[in-house]
């Protein structure tokens, strides 16, 4: 009698339609891992039990004039933000904080992702609508209206596009710089399937900070991220961006509260420093809907302070660590802007 594993690996009798479905990537049904060795782990992460929200994670409903204006401008120009799509808890503060300066992170390439990471609430499809050709110009117009000096551009994954959307990304950066050369641009990119040409296209467009998130520690990648993403590939993306432009500021982010150990967090931070990543942010994972991975632990503010200290000791130029910190949270704050200006002067471009 053939073993169960052998039967699972035999694709010769799978219908053509099913083989195409597998090749195109996972749908929601594929998130149910059927391996017997994974059942106990999956029960922990997908059970109906939810941890009560601690007081330090409760935020206010956004109602400021700055928030309302930014929201209206986005709708009029048909733009998307990761702040909304990912249900970020900081949207009220970033869009209309005490300073009155909007710091929304613009999401290009549409609002539909070709991947289905188990922590993310952005909608998914195997073949999303084509990118809006007017989006680069509309994004630049909106940013010029807001009068910002620092902006974060991010995107969904677009595995359906031959270049992963890198040229669209680059065009958006160029349109922004065309209207305001002094504006600092941070790009938070997907992994582009590890395509070095795509990474170089974005870097060479004139970005000031190149960010790509490893999201979680190595041993939890399979549980948290889409199967097409992996730890080593993310490290290679960050490493190659630095090879293309050694003076480029590189940045990444890790979510905590998914069941990671202190040892695995420390090793991840060491791995990132080994490839000269400059900036790191650490924040609490928040379950966006009941269909996503459950929170395993609400990490205390004191523990986040510990990791900020560790980051500084390891040599990161900038470490932001806190329960509500996200990869683009207060990205344009004073220290990071100064770091970028310093690198630009070293490169002779400031």
UniProtKB/Swiss-Prot annotation:
Record keywords: 4Fe-4S, Iron, Iron-sulfur, Metal-binding, Mitochondrion, S-adenosyl-L-methionine, Transferase
GO molecular function: 4 iron, 4 sulfur cluster binding; lipoate synthase activity; metal ion binding
GO biological processes: lipoate biosynthetic process
The record's free-text note on cofactor binding: Binds 2 [4Fe-4S] clusters per subunit. One cluster is coordinated with 3 cysteines and an exchangeable S-adenosyl-L-methionine.
SUPFAM superfamilies documented for this protein: Radical SAM enzymes (SSF102114)
Membrane-spanning intervals of the chain: none
Annotated [4Fe-4S] cluster 2 binding sites: 113, 117, 120
Keyword 4Fe-4S: yes
Protein residues bound to [4Fe-4S] cluster 1: 83, 88, 94, 328
Highest taxon of the lineage: Eukaryota
EC number: 2.8.1.8
Main location: mitochondrion
UniProt keyword Cell cycle, yes or no: no
PANTHER family: LIPOYL SYNTHASE, LIPOYL SYNTHASE, MITOCHONDRIAL
HAMAP family per the UniProt record, alphabetical: Lipoyl_synth
UniProt protein name: Lipoyl synthase, mitochondrial
Species the sequence originates in: Trichoplax adhaerens (Trichoplax reptans)
């Amino acid at each position: 009698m053939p073993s169960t594993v052998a039967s699972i690996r035999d694709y010769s009798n799978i219908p053509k339609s099913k083989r195409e479905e597998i090749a195109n990537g996972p749908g929601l049904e594929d998130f149910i891992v059927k391996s017997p060795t994974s059942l106990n782990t999956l029960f922990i992460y997908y059970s109906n039990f939810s941890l009560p929200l601690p007081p330090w994670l409760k935020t206010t409903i956004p109602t400021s004039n700055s928030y309302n204006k930014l929201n209206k401008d986005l709708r009029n120009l048909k733009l998307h933000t990761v702040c909304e799509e990912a249900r970020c808890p900081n949207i009220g503060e970033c869009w209309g904080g005490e300073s009155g300066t909007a710091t929304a992170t613009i999401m290009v390439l549409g609002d539909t992702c070709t991947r289905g990471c188990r922590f993310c609430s952005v909608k998914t499809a195997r073949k999303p609508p084509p990118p809006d050709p007017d989006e680069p110009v509309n994004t630049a117009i909106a940013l010029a209206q807001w009068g910002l000096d620092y902006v974060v551009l991010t995107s969904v994954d677009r595995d359906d596009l031959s270049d992963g959307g890198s040229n669209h990304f680059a065009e958006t950066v160029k349109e922004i710089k065309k209207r305001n050369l002094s504006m600092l641009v941070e790009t938070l990119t997907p992994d582009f399937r590890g395509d070095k040409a795509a990474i170089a296209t974005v870097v060479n467009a004139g970005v000031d900070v190149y960010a790509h998130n490893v999201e979680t520690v190595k041993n939890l990648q399979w549980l948290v991220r889409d199967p097409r993403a992996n730890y080593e590939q993310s490290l290679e993306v960050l490493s190659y961006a630095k090879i293309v432009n050694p003076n480029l500021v590189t940045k990444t982010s890790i979510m905590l509260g998914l069941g990671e150990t202190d040892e695995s967090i420390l090793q991840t931070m060491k791995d990132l420093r080994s490839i000269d990543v400059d900036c790191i942010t650490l924040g609490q994972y928040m379950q966006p809907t009941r269909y996503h991975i459950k929170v395993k632990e609400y990490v205390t503010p004191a523990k986040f302070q510990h990791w900020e200290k560790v980051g500084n000791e390891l040599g990161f130029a900038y470490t932001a660590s806190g329960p509500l910190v996200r990869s683009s949270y207060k990205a344009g704050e004073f220290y990071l802007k100064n770091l970028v200006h310093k690198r630009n002067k070293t490169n002779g471009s400031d």
